[in-house]
Curated annotation (Swiss-Prot):
Catalytic activity from the UniProt record: tRNA(Leu) + L-leucine + ATP = L-leucyl-tRNA(Leu) + AMP + diphosphate
UniProt short sequence motif 'HIGH' region, positions renumbered to this chain: 41-51
EC number, as in UniProt: 6.1.1.4
A GO BP annotation: leucyl-tRNA aminoacylation
Superkingdom of origin organism: Bacteria
GO cellular component: cytosol
Protein name (Swiss-Prot/TrEMBL): Leucine--tRNA ligase
GO molecular function: aminoacyl-tRNA deacylase activity; ATP binding; leucine-tRNA ligase activity
């Protein structure tokens, strides 16, 4: 008996696909297109199970849509810049490029071993000068249109390494490499003005009907559109004013103190030369050491310090203390809040901690007419809903909605503030004081100032022979041959920018480059990009729900506005796949629960690995790795392999359903029902697990059918061929092998996807459950087209049913055609 040998079969078909360039994309703009794209990986050197899952999902869709006749674009590339390569270079005294390209080679071999159908002719690598030339071109387009600018911003600075650290490189306030305490330092940095697009990025989420709601909600929250009012509070004894932002101007009479963010420009000014200066500056230093993430945490212990200064409430003239607090961030609003502890829970907790006044100015609607504030002891928590105003001269008795409108109007008329729309979103800081990134294409000339590098001089290339012996200091700044250049405007000496770009910039447009990756004259050809885009199906982890997807949407809108493309959104449909867990926890080396794709391929083969990972859970849910489940998938493929090999010589005649026996009809019906289910599950719902389950059921039914005395060989052949075609997107190697076993020369992946016949799915008979008062008492087989009256009669005649209804009063008989009869009696 011929045994299933997956490794032998898989290497055979992978070689053939490679030799025949089977998956090169057809350039035919007249065909209907389907662009399926998985988020490209960082070339760490090894695929993990999360990779295997996402690339298996994408490959199923690519193979399925090819068989349905679409012109499919299914490319792959490498998000290849970033810190790990630079760190490896420092540790191993190697070049980041050599480390990166070695990893790419290894991961490419692994991807091909999975049986993926990528068009490798379109492969891109973001660290290649051919690619980052166009990343730099993108920067210049933003710069020309006022969307790239430079300003000072705080960074994490390691005084020992003399370099800027990313947030993730700061561990408990110390440098991850040398353990020195990290300082906050103001550096001049490049930003992209993504805030110019905040409203469109927010509004256009409505266009993304086939994105998961949770992803859209995460983006909406990150953009953080908020309607509110900015109000100027004069500083007592000064001509200065502090502008505060609030979404609840109706509570202004309840403001009992102000809180500034430690980064607020007035903080130092307020305490300079005062008794409070040292205490406040020490507090600010401590807050900076916490890091931004800790300050944004829900369970943050809210702390503050008094500046010794007072602000004046512009509507009632009350003096309120000005504090600096760790829970106020410069990124939100104006970096200053009017604190209303009676109506904001954070302010309430802070006021209790520092014994600050609490004054109620809004009461629930049913409390209308109440005029006296509750005491500290009476108010157990802040009342944060809208209500009726009290203790607010000139506004008492108004609803919150009325007061918000009126107070904002009055503030505007007095010239002490305005109604505003604000966003949580801040401009995108793209400068990185690192070597392994795309150089920012800017020059500095003493005579001419800041100048963009001329487009015909792109790319500004990274020097290859760099020295990392000094650790993580800015390598580019130390290279005079890189820094020193001439000014394109005056011809004098100039210096290059030594910062490189955030790696998110490279991944914000790669999906456009895939449409024309070999063209060195343009980043993409308009006729190609407008044909292929937007991506029909984008697939990637939920961890990219905000930043990557938001930046990609931003770049797409910029390209649209500048006339380079004709689409406003990059991804029509998004699938955020779940994690792969083992023993109830995410796979990780530290937990010792990692299963390597290489290990699965060696033991069971790629088809088994793919089948299990697609069968074990719906793609958007977390998947729990299960060795028994993998074994089960392997045994299924073994059974199928034997079934087809044992029946490879079946006759292939035209089917004549007029001669079908009852068993033939049932088997024929199941074939067509399976085609419909698998088609719908893949295309509409992406329920690969239920599609595979249906194929397994048809396989089991085929095994049973062939054991009958009278077998219609042509029908059995049809069933086996259908199974092989339906499995082809999931398990591409064994499908090719079995198709060849059945006597065909062409690739199974070049076939048309099987179609189903609605008529063939209609059963001649229906087996129905018969209930009496909701309890199952019998089963009934009737012709499928029986009328309700006929079904009622037959059900009531049943001997088993008579036993329960004899002598009873029948109230009604409920019939659900072809499924159920329920007799209700008393």
């Amino acid at each position: 008996m011929k045994e299933y040998q997956p490794q032998k079969i898989e290497s055979k078909w992978q070689k053939r696909w490679q030799d025949e360039i089977s998956y090169e994309t057809e350039v035919d703009h007249n065909k209907d297109k389907y662009y399926v794209l998985e988020m490209f990986p960082y070339p760490s050197g090894k695929l993990h199970m999360g990779h295997m899952r996402v690339y298996s999902i994408g490959d199923v869709l690519a193979r399925f849509q090819r068989m349905r006749g679409y012109n499919v674009l299914h490319p792959m590339g490498w998000d290849a810049f970033g810190l790990p390569a630079e760190n490896a270079a420092i540790e191993n005294q190697d070049l980041p490029s050599r480390w990166t390209y070695a990893n790419i080679d290894n991961m490419k071999d692994q991807l091909q071993a999975l049986g993926t159908s990528y068009d490798w002719k379109r492969e891109v690598s973001t660290c290649s000068p051919d690619y980052y030339k166009w990343t730099q071109w993108m920067f210049l387009q933003l710069y020309k249109n006022g969307l790239a600018y430079k300003k000072k911003a705080p960074v994490n600075w390691c005084p020992e390494c003399e370099t800027v650290l990313a947030n993730e490189q700061v561990e408990n306030g110390a440098c991850w490499r040398c353990d020195s305490m990290v300082e906050q330092k103001q550096l001049s940095q490049w930003f992209f003005k993504i805030t110019e697009y905040a409203d469109r990025l927010d509004q256009d989420l409505e266009l993304l009907e086939e994105w998961p709601d949770r992803v859209k909600t995460m983006q909406k929250n990150w953009i953080g559109k908020s309607q509110g009012t900015e109000i100027d509070f004069p500083v007592k004894g000064s001509r200065e004013k502090i502008r505060a932002f609030t979404t609840r101007p109706d509570t202004i009479f309840g403001a009992t103190y102000m809180v500034l963010a430690p980064e607020h420009p007035m903080t130092e000014q307020l305490v300079q030369g005062t008794d409070q200066e040292k205490e406040v500056m020490d507090f600010i230093k401590g807050v900076h050491e916490m890091g931004k993430e800790a300050r944004e945490a829900e369970d943050l212990e809210k702390e503050g310090v008094f500046t010794g200064r007072w602000a004046i409430n512009p509507l009632n003239g009350e003096e309120i203390p000005i504090l600096v607090g760790n829970y106020v961030l410069m990124e939100y609003g104006t970096g200053a809040i009017m604190a209303v502890p009676a109506h904001d829970q954070r302010d309430f907790q802070f006021a209790h901690k520092y014994n600050l006044p609490i004054k109620e100015v809004v009461t629930p609607p049913e409390g209308e007419g109440k005029t006296e504030s509750e005491t500290h002891d009476e108010l157990k928590k802040a009342y944060t809903d809208h209500g009726i105003l009290i203790n607010s001269p000139g506004y008492n008795g108004m609803t919150s909605e009325q007061a918000i409108e009126q107070i904002t109007r009055d503030i505007e008329n007095k010239g002490i503030g305005a109604g505003v729309t604000t966003y949580r979103l801040r401009d995108w800081l793209v400068s990185r004081q690192r070597y392994w990134g795309a150089p920012i294409p800017v020059l500095y000339c003493d005579q001419c100032g800041i100048l963009p590098v001329p487009e015909d001089e792109l790319p500004v290339q990274l020097p290859e022979d760099v020295d990392f012996s000094q650790g993580s200091r800015n390598v580019l700044a130390a290279r005079q041959d890189f820094v020193e250049t001439s000014c394109p405007q005056c011809g004098g000496s100039a210096q290059r920018e030594t910062d490189t770009m955030d790696t998110f910039v490279c991944s914000s447009w790669y999906f456009l480059r895939y449409t024309t990756p070999w063209d060195n004259e343009v980043p993409f050809r308009q006729e190609d990009v407008n044909y292929w885009m937007p991506v029909d199906q984008y697939i990637g982890g939920i961890e990219h729900a905000v930043l990557h997807l938001l930046y990609a949407r931003f770049f797409t809108k910029v390209m649209y506005d500048q006339g380079y493309t004709n689409f406003k959104e990059p991804f029509s449909r998004l699938l955020a796949q779940g994690m792969v867990n083992k023993d109830g926890a995410k796979m990780s080396k530290s937990k010792g629960n990692v299963v390597s794709p290489d290990e699965i391929l060696r033991t069971y083969g790629a088809d088994t690995g793919r089948l299990f990972i697609l069968f074990a859970a719906p793609p958007e849910k977390d998947l729990d790795w299960n060795d028994e489940g993998v074994e089960g998938c392997y045994r299924f493929l073994q059974r199928l392999y034997r079934l087809v090999n044992d029946n490879q010589n079946l006759v292939d005649l035209q089917l004549d359903d007029t001669k079908f026996t009852k068993e033939d009809k049932e088997y024929h019906r199941l074939i067509h029902k399976t085609i419909k289910k698998v088609t719908d599950d893949i295309s509409e719902r992406h329920n690969f697990n239920t599609a595979i389950s249906a194929i397994m059921e048809l396989t089991n039914a085929s095994s049973k059918y062939k054991e009958q005395k009278e077998v219609n060989e042509s029908l059995l052949r049809t069933g086996l061929e259908t199974i092989v075609m339906l499995l082809a997107p999931f398990t591409p190697h064994i499908a090719e092998e079995l198709w060849e076993t059945l006597g065909y020369q062409d690739s199974v992946h070049k076939l048309n996807w099987p179609s189903y016949d609605e008529k063939a799915m209609v059963a001649e008979e229906a087996e129905m459950v018969v209930q009496v008062n909701g309890k199952v008492r019998d089963h009934l087989t009737v012709p499928a087209d029986s009328s309700e009256e006929t079904i009622k009669e037959k059900a009531l005649e049943r001997e088993k049913v008579q036993k329960y209804i004899s002598g009873a009063e029948i109230k009604k008989v409920i019939v659900i055609p072809q499924k159920l009869v329920n007799i209700v009696c008393k």
